[in-house]
């Protein structure tokens, strides 16, 4: 036994660095073996990393769970009540909008059914012409025709020529061309055109000024200061692209001659390029409704409506009494009409007299025009609200029409409802099934509004759904302009002259899409963003909701994208 024990005790490796079985069986003090230390350290790190990963996973899960709970709480306690409140607000606004349109439509229909034409309500006998030529000419009142223009190279000949061809004694007519052009070549062309008509015996006055202060209002105000204007009893106004028929004055001036309380005769616009593209067809539908329903109703109800800025004839005395042309807003025409209306003067709209004009053919021109037409009235309403309420020469009902119907319902509530309901609330409803919209608000009211608008242009009734989607997009632009005007932001008084392309024969020769039309100039981020939001809502509704609401959302998103990339209208080089 001793021998075997001795042999076992003396079984020691000769190499001190080698590892024996006992090294693994018995604990070895730390640091006695580098290899052992490395393996032990790696194991510790692995265990520690695994523990850290489990800890991170638990932490992330806890954070996600808390975020989900927070989102559910925010959703149920904040967003859902807000959206339900928005639904109620839109219900009220939709009723207001529909009631206003039904009211105007009924008035317009009654006027037509009862044949209450202006010629039957007002005396408008032709101006008496005596046998003697000199006496006959003297019986015609002196009329001034004002044509303000700014770099109107494509159309200046149209308006000047049409004004000079008006059937009226030459010695009783003054054509005043107010040229604010900054292009020397255009200025020279306009001057020579005036000289050409002057040589034909027409009394044409070519007027310029040093600067463009006040834009169109400043130009008209400067023209009214000329000495020869004081001898004129009536003032007809034409924008550079308007072409009145030869008998324009023969049909309009008698209303003012025989009715001393009338201040303004407004005629209807007719569009020479309505069939040029889809954009002009959409505009024609809106403008026809404006003239046939809104202007007709305003004229019949309380002898007041917004002056359209052109194709109208004013009593010069009224312009002076009302304070002349003001440039405090971009709606100088509406400004003058309001001030004249508050003095008790009456207006008449004569829809049977049509004046040819041009619709904006490019989306850029149309957007700038709509900005001006939305921004100006909003600022004007802000400036004149208390003045309207304090007016003593108008009745309570006329004040109500001026404030509620003319401004609040038609220009503020209608614009806000159209954009917010169809482009914000409806797509958000897809993600919030808890929010319910009544069927009558969702379908019946929009359908009624569409049908009421279709009466303006019966020939385009097949485009009424497309017009509805188009107007929803333009409501975004109008709402933005309305807010800018009301709060007098940076572009509140921005005046950009609407680009005109001339008559249809010239338009046919224009290249529709030019190579130098840069992509960034056709890129409108806000429309594209909302279009993307609507497209996302449409996809979500198709995948997760059991309805066909995605059809409307998809259709509306397509129109947003079409306008966002300027795929409507004519594209021309600048």
From Swiss-Prot:
InterPro entries given in the database record: Glyco_trans_2-like (IPR001173), Nucleotide-diphossugar_trans (IPR029044)
Positions of transmembrane segments: 87-107, 412-432, 437-457, 523-543, 548-568
One GO MF term attached to the UniProt entry: mannan synthase activity
Gene Ontology biological process: cell wall organization
Alphabetized Pfam families for the sequence: Glyco_trans_2_3
UniProt main location, coarse: Golgi
EC number: 2.4.1.32
Reactions catalysed, as given in the entry: GDP-mannose + (glucomannan)n = GDP + (glucomannan)n+1
Active site feature: 180, 333
Chain residues that bind substrate: 239, 241
Family designation: Belongs to the glycosyltransferase 2 family. Plant cellulose synthase-like A subfamily.
Role noted for this protein: Probable mannan synthase which consists of a 4-beta-mannosyltransferase activity on mannan using GDP-mannose. The beta-1,4-mannan product is the backbone for galactomannan synthesis by galactomannan galactosyltransferase. Galactomannan is a noncellulosic polysaccharides of plant cell wall.
Name by which UniProt lists this protein: Probable glucomannan 4-beta-mannosyltransferase 6
């Amino acid at each position: 036994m001793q021998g075997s024990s001795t042999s076992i005790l003396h079984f020691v490796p000769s190499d001190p660095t080698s590892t024996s079985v006992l090294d693994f069986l018995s604990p070895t003090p730390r640091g006695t073996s580098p290899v052992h230390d490395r393996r032990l350290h790696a194991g510790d790190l692995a265990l520690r990393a695994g523990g850290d990963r489990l800890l991170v996973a638990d932490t992330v899960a806890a954070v996600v769970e808390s975020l989900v709970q927070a989102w559910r709480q925010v959703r149920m306690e904040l967003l859902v009540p807000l959206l339900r409140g928005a639904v109620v607000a839109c219900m009220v606004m939709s009723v207001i909008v529909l009631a206003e349109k039904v009211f105007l439509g009924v008035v317009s229909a009654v006027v037509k059914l009862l044949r209450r034409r202006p010629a039957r309500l007002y005396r408008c006998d032709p101006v008496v012409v005596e046998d003697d030529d000199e006496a006959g000419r003297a019986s015609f009142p002196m009329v001034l025709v004002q044509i303000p223009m700014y770099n109107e190279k494509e159309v200046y000949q149209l308006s000047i020529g049409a004004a000079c061809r008006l059937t009226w004694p030459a010695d009783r007519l003054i054509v005043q061309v107010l040229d604010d052009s900054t292009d020397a070549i255009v200025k020279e062309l306009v001057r020579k055109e005036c000289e050409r008509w002057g040589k034909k015996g027409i009394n044409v006055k070519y007027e310029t000024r040093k600067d463009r202060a006040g834009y169109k209002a400043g130009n008209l105000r400067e023209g009214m200061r000329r000495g020869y204007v004081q001898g004129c009893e009536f003032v007809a106004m034409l924008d550079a692209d308007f072409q009145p028929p030869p008998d324009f004055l023969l049909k309009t001036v008698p209303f003012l001659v025989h009715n001393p309380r009338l201040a303004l005769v407004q005629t209807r616009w007719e569009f020479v390029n309505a069939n040029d593209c889809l954009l002009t067809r959409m505009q024609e539908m809106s403008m026809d409704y404006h003239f046939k329903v809104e202007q007709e109703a305003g004229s019949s109800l309380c002898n007041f409506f917004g002056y359209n800025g052109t194709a109208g004839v004013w009593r010069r005395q009224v312009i002076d009494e009302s304070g002349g042309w003001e440039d405090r807003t971009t709606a100088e025409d509406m400004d003058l009409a309001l001030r004249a209306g508050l003095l008790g003067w009456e207006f008449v709209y004569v829809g049977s007299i049509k004046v040819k004009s041009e619709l904006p053919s490019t989306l850029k021109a149309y957007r700038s025009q709509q900005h001006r037409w939305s921004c100006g009235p909003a600022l004007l309403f802000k400036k004149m609200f208390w003045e309207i309420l304090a007016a003593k020469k108008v009745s309570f009902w006329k004040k109500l029409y001026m404030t509620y119907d003319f401004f609040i319902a038609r220009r503020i509530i209608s614009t806000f409802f159209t954009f917010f309901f169809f482009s914000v609330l409806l797509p958000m409803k897809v993600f919030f099934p808890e929010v319910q919209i009544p069927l009558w608000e969702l379908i019946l009211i929009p359908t009624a509004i569409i049908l009421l608008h279709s009466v303006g242009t019966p020939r385009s009734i097949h485009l009424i759904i497309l017009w509805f989607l188009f107007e929803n997009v333009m409501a975004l632009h109008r709402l933005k302009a309305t807010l800018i005007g009301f709060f007098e932001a940076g572009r509140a008084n921005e005046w950009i002259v609407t680009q005109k392309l001339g008559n249809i024969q010239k338009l046919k020769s224009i290249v529709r899409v030019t190579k130098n039309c840069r992509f960034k100039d056709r890129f409108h981020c806000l429309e594209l963003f909302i279009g993307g939001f609507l497209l996302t809502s449409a996809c979500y509704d198709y995948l997760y909701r059991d309805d066909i609401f995605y059809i409307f959302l998809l259709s509306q998103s397509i129109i947003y994208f079409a306008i966002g990339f300027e795929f409507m209208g004519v594209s021309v080089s600048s």
